[in-house]
Amino acid sequence: MCLLARVRHIEITPDVNGNMFFWHFQNKHIANKQRTVIWLNGGPGCSSEDGALMEIGPYRLKDKDTLVYNEGAWNEFANVLFVDNPVGTGFSYVDTNAYVRELDVMADQFVTFLEKWFKLFPEYEHDDIFIAGESYAGQYIPYIAKAILERNKKGGESSYKWNLAGLLIGNGWISPPEQYEAYLQFAYEKGIVKKGSDAASKLEVQQRICSKQLAVGPALVDNTDCEKILQDLLQLTATSKGGEQRCVNMYDVRLTDTYPSCGMNWPPDLDAVTPYLRRNDVIQALHVNPNKVTGWVECNGQVGANFKPSSKPSVELLPDLLKEVPIILFSGSEDLICNHLGTEALISNLQWNGGKGFEITPGTWAPRRDWTFEGEAAGFWQEARNLTYVVFYNSSHMVPFDYPRRTRDMLDRFMGVDISSIGGKPTDSRLDGEKVPETTVGGVAGNGTDAQQAEKEKLDTARWEAYRKSGEIVLVIVAFSAAGWGWWVWRERKKRRGYMGVSGGENISPSGEARGREGFRDKRSAADLEAGDFDENELDDLHMRTPTTVMGGEGNDPRYSVGAASEDSEDEEDVKGKGKEKMSG
């Protein structure tokens, strides 16, 4: 199977060398209509290659040299466009004095990117467009959606209205007041902090300071006093073991990490992704502009340090967006930094489309419907008035990392994928025990492990049949050749007996041995994306052969997240944020 992928930079702000990098994968199947999903990781300053190679892209890295197929990839029924946003993130770049500071500026630049992208690829401009992401993308996505809707309303003869069909935000940083307060609440619920303990008393004091700041100050995306709640929580709950301090992994509380990393060494795939994206052959295959002089880092600390928006938090944009666009918020149950309790609190306090929270009539709330996926308890769904909320059980901050197939089921359901014209075995996905509209995850006709195995067996059978027929032909040829050879030998011997006295009796040996067959062998092994030769002067199309042998399974503020400088530059730090400089998502 071959996948069509396109990669390159698009210039956004030429006066400051602002360029954005994208990686686009074409869909494998078209189910009733064309769709494009735009994926953004968070940070701010964290690369969407995280999403491409560790979450929803068609490949995962088994190690730094081996790509394997991701059975839950989101490009089954949708084109997927990964963008390193804002400028300076991942393979994107900009002059160091021109990093983005505000969310509205970021959104305007992203619309500029899309305008230029659709000029390059006009065949996708009529697609249903979905914008998805996680963590600090909970700020990016609503602002970008607002900018797109405003662009559509301005119109113009040359402006086609983009069909913004939906937004998906996973473990998003959306509403600081509720989400800051949820740190300690979540820690109590999970037993990380015991109520009444010294640690609890100290954290409650800091939470009161935070609440006071939020009450008197302007509504901002982040607050230093509130950030300290999480910093103190991780420090106060750290333990010593074997001379090493360990702390809770803030992205998956089932795990621990060395202090003060507390999750920055996670996920484990990062150990392979970073060296892979720094390989010269990969950089060349991805057509990374030579003007990008530093190596890839997951999160650019300078982007995060400069991103200090005075913009209002994105939660304030949701009511108007929900009038026009369906939104799905989803949460991994084991994430601390953007935990589900905070998301549920912000939904409960939100007023939209004539109601508050998930109240469907006065005193009646939309039910939480138990979700099972292939016979296992997967989480629950809740929805009302254009907003859907999904919790994934036993999952981290990066839900698609843990459950790519379940998130694909969620995506297909949200997009309204109709598989009736495609075939394949429907996925057993149920809400409250009832079969829901059918989706297919890894089981589309001609796709998935079963189909691939059947196709392999079919090809093997055809191959051996060809060999058998070829063998029969060869036997006939050999028989005729042997007869001809025998006749030729008999004739030559007869000649030599007549000319022996003249020729001196030398035996004339025929020369018929072929030479140089090694030169015809293609010694290049089955290739992943970097193996082919690409013309730098042409549109950057990467045709990637799907591996089938291995299948993938299911700043200046005292912010905790600021990490060590990267190997490449003091200006770039490998930082994770929640959104904020706290998470790669």
Curated annotation (Swiss-Prot):
UniProt keyword Hydrolase present: yes
Residue spans crossing the bilayer: 470-490
Chain coiled-coil ranges: none
Catalysed reactions, as listed in the record: Preferential release of a C-terminal arginine or lysine residue
Sorted UniProt keywords: Apoptosis, Carboxypeptidase, Glycoprotein, Golgi apparatus, Hydrolase, Membrane, Protease, Signal, Transmembrane, Transmembrane helix
Enzyme class (EC, first level): hydrolase
Renumbered residue ranges of the record's region Disordered: 526-585
Extent of Basic and acidic residues compositional bias: 575-585
Sequence ranges of Acidic residues compositional bias: 530-539
Protein name: Pheromone-processing carboxypeptidase KEX1
